[in-house]
């Protein structure tokens, strides 16, 4: 399975190599070509209308210096503290640049290891997982070397030096997988909430407005859950934190 993943990445890098060159010559031209191949309509940067068009405009023209800090799972903690939201941060057990230095013998029974610059660079120890020290070190060292392709215009990734963190394992009271709430904010105001379920099995996404009315046809390539998702009791609090954290940005997704 790992060999297949590695080969897919190699093939992807080869296919996208010309686009990496094009991005250096003309970022606008590069994103226009990739956008058309993916979305099947022309990218309008002069007067963007759709959400996807506006994301490309932000990548090209909105160089907010906070973006790199907020894209890294460790450095974002400082930003959260400065926004006076430090109480919502998960407990940090350890951080460092060398996975060999992780204090394995002193870790709790349950924990999560993350490399800070990728969305899938996670190792979850739920108390029963069979994970060897050598396996953790090997995976983390590989992930630390991962680079983001420049052709996507995501300049904010890779600015901060990636590191390894160990965080507290968070679990739900009913032993179900945690629901992941992502709040889409525009000019510092929450407008939409995405709820991710079954992330590690059959990933599903449901979308709601801030009154918890379901938003149909808002998918991002994943199916809806088909289940009733109750309005969180702390929704107002969740939206207020999202409002405070997104204030410095014209658009932000607060997870």
Where are these regions (language model features)?
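Membrane-proximal basic amphipathic "stem/tether" segments
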Residues: 1-62
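A conserved helix-loop-beta module that forms one wall/lid of the active-site cleft
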Residues: 47-129, 140-155
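Short beta-turn/strand-loop junction motif enriched in small, turn-promoting residues
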Residues: 97-98, 170-172, 251
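Residue-level marker for the onset of beta-strands and adjacent loop->beta junctions
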Residues: 100, 179-180, 252
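Phosphate-binding site of ATP-dependent enzymes
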Residues: 107, 132-221
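A long amphipathic alpha-helix within ATP-dependent nucleotide-binding catalytic cores
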Residues: 159-163, 206-254
């Amino acid at each position: 399975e790992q060999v297949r993943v590695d080969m897919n990445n190699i093939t992807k890098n080869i296919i996208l190599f010309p686009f990496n060159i094009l991005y250096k010559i003309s970022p606008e031209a590069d994103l226009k070509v990739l956008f058309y191949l993916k979305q099947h309509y022309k990218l309008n940067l002069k007067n963007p209308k759709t959400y996807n068009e506006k994301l490309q405009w932000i990548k090209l023209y909105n160089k907010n210096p906070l973006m790199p800090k907020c894209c890294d799972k460790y450095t974002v903690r400082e930003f959260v503290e400065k926004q006076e939201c430090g109480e919502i941060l998960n407990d940090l057990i350890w951080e460092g640049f060398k996975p060999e230095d992780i204090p394995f013998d002193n870790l709790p029974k349950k924990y999560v290891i993350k490399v800070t610059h990728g969305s899938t660079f996670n190792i979850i120890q739920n108390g029963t997982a069979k994970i060897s020290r050598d396996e953790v070190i090997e995976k983390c060292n590989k992930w630390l070397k991962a680079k983001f392709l420049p052709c996507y215009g995501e300049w904010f990734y890779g600015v901060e030096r990636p590191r390894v963190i160990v965080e507290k394992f968070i679990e739900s009271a009913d032993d179900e997988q945690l629901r992941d709430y992502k709040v889409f904010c525009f000019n510092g105001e929450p407008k939409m909430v995405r709820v991710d379920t079954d992330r590690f099995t059959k990933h599903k996404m449901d979308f709601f407005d801030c009154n918890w009315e379901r938003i149909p046809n808002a998918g991002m390539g994943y199916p809806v859950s088909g289940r009733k998702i109750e309005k969180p009791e702390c929704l107002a609090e969740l939206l207020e934190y999202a409002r405070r954290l997104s204030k410095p940005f014209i658009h932000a997704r607060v997870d």
